[in-house]
Curated annotation (Swiss-Prot), chain B:
Organism: Arabidopsis thaliana
GO molecular function, one term: ubiquitin-protein transferase activator activity
The protein, known as: Cell division cycle 20.5, cofactor of APC complex
The organism's place on the tree of life at top rank: Eukaryota
A Pfam family that the UniProt record links to this protein: WD40_CDC20-Fz
InterPro entries, sorted: Cdc20/Fizzy, WD40/YVTN_repeat-like_dom_sf, WD40_CDC20-Fz, WD40_repeat_CS, WD40_repeat_dom_sf, WD40_rpt
Metabolic or biological pathway, per its Swiss-Prot or TrEMBL entry: Protein modification; protein ubiquitination
Length: 53, 450
């Protein structure tokens, strides 16, 4: 079966995992830094932040 | 010089020559208080004196027509109020005749809606699978967003902004390959890599059932039709499960030779659209009466896409109209009359079409795309003019889900972010009342016969 829609792309998690093995950082601690569905704030979004509904 | 003057003399009876001679004389005898006949427009004077009043009585109905009439009057130089002219202005006349009409835009009847170009929220989505064939995002009618991140399903309450974990699937069964809310937004179907489907009650947060035996490989597509859960698998099969029955498999649709990656019931629940990795779209007929033959032939088969079809969207304001989007090797959005099977339109978007959503209030279609721009594009239907392009994702935008009120769209991509876009604007008041009424319905948890 041909996987015609496959695009191999390095995700940020994969990049961090790669970096952590190089730097010897514990992967568990690295995973805990990211909050699932946590708010990611950046400058352009702060002004536009508003409550849904 | 001598020849010219003699020529003019010879044709003294010609009115044009008389006109020139009189003009020359008038220049010599210029007077501020005597009207200059050569400078007057007698045709306009006649019109103004006879029909001008009639136009004043007429009432222009709409603003656009008024703008059109104004522009037309300016182009034809009909805005003058004076009839008598005391000076000959040849340059003004020439420039007036040859000048282009003004390029100002006519007053639009409907002002264009402001569409924010930035997402209003960005949420972290670590571990979301960058797999074109899965369906990992759904926004239920109880205003809870479900998203599958690897082995775990998270629920995000859009009303309160709180997040909680529903379930983490065992490694032998997982990861999660698809999720889909029931119409009442209270139960969630979870398709797994091991070919099983779990049903979860999200009010009490407990599993109520596991469906087995329908597929031989992962279940990447799910679609609810009241109490029927339709599943699409990597094996190309489409299975209708009646979740009220112990032996749940009531129908199997065979037609796709490769993975089923798009699955959508029409709003009436009578037609099912399926898209596959075989570049084919099928339309299936759902009949409530159980037949002796559990395997059914399709109503229509569309083979015009040249890549996998994952994006499917039934039009909410025109029954039987289906929009489909093709993958990398196609990049087109096509519109189908699913009653006749005719392809009504085909639009080249320039990149992989991953997902499609219709607006619930306007005649607009939102598409999400892959390489190179990874953008969301808002189209005006049926002209298919681009109204907006929403950027921010740095990877292909595989998944889109629409809020129950129809205003907000959530998009998730392989860049592991979930973005919320206020793209469809504020709903009309009637729609909002209807939407709020639906949630406060005391018997919302009971299945309605539609």
């Amino acid at each position: 079966m041909m996987e015609q829609e496959i695009w191999v792309r390095v995700t940020r998690a994969a990049a961090k995992r790669k970096a952590s093995t190089a730097m010897g950082i514990d992967e568990d601690r690295l995973n805990k830094k990211r909050v699932f569905l946590g708010e990611l704030l950046n400058v352009s979004n702060v002004n536009l932040l508003s409550n849904l509904n | 010089m001598m020849n010219t003057s003699s020529h003019l003399k010879a044709q003294a009876s010609c009115p044009l020559v008389e006109h020139f001679l009189r003009r020359k004389l008038s220049k010599e005898n210029f007077d501020r208080f005597i009207p200059n006949r050569s400078a007057m427009d007698f045709d306009f004077a006649n019109y103004a004196l006879t029909q001008g009043r009639k136009r004043n009585v007429d009432e222009v109905t709409s603003a656009s027509r008024k703008a059109y009439m104004t522009q037309l009057a300016e182009a034809m130089n009909q805005n003058r109020t004076r009839i008598l002219a005391f000076r000959n202005k040849p340059k003004a006349l020439l420039s007036s005749n040859h000048s282009d009409p003004p390029h100002q835009q006519p007053i639009s009847v409907k002002p264009r809606r402001y569409i924010p170009q930035n997402s209003e929220r960005v949420l972290d989505a670590p571990g979301i699978a960058d797999d074109f064939y899965l369906n990992l995002l759904d926004w239920g009618s109880s205003n809870v967003l479900a998203i599958a991140l690897g082995d775990t399903v998270y629920l995000w309450d859009a009303s309160s902004g709180s997040t909680y974990k529903l379930v983490t699937i065992d490694e032998e069964e997982g990861p999660v390959t698809s999720i889909n809310w029931t119409q009442d937004g209270l139960d969630l179907a979870i398709g797994l890599d091991n070919s099983e489907v779990q049903l979860w009650d999200c009010v009490s947060n407990r599993q109520v059932r596991t469906l087995r035996g329908g597929h031989e490989s992962r279940v990447g597509s799910l679609a609810w039709n009241n109490h029927i859960l339709t599943t699409g698998g990597m094996d190309g099969k489409i299975v209708n499960n009646d979740v009220r029955i112990r032996s749940s498999i009531v129908e199997t649709y065979l037609g796709h030779t490769e993975e089923v990656c798009g699955l959508k019931w029409s709003e009436s629940g009578k037609k099912l659209a399926s898209g596959g990795n075989d570049n084919v779209v099928h339309i299936w007929d759902h009949r409530s009466v159980a037949s002796s033959n559990p395997t059914r032939q399709w109503l229509h088969r569309f083979e015009e896409h040249t890549a996998a079809v994952r994006a499917l969207a039934w039009c909410p304001f025109q029954a039987s109209l289906l929009a489909t989007g093709g993958g990398v090797g196609d990049g087109k959005i096509k519109f189908w009359n699913t009653h006749t099977g005719a392809c009504l339109n085909s639009v080249e978007t320039g990149s992989q079409v991953c997902s499609l959503l219709w607006s619930k209030s306007e005649r607009e279609l939102l598409s999400s795309h892959g390489f190179t721009q990874n953008q969301l594009t808002l189209w005006k239907y049926p002209s298919m003019v681009k109204m907006a392009e929403l950027n921010g994702h740095t990877s292909r935008v595989l998944f889109m889900a629409q809020s129950p009120d129809g205003c907000t769209v959530a998009s998730a991509a392989g860049d592991e972010t979930l973005r919320l876009w206020n793209v469809f604007g504020e709903p009309p008041k009637t729609t909002k009342k209807a939407a709020s009424k639906k949630y406060t319905d005391p018997f919302a948890h009971v299945n309605h016969i539609r």
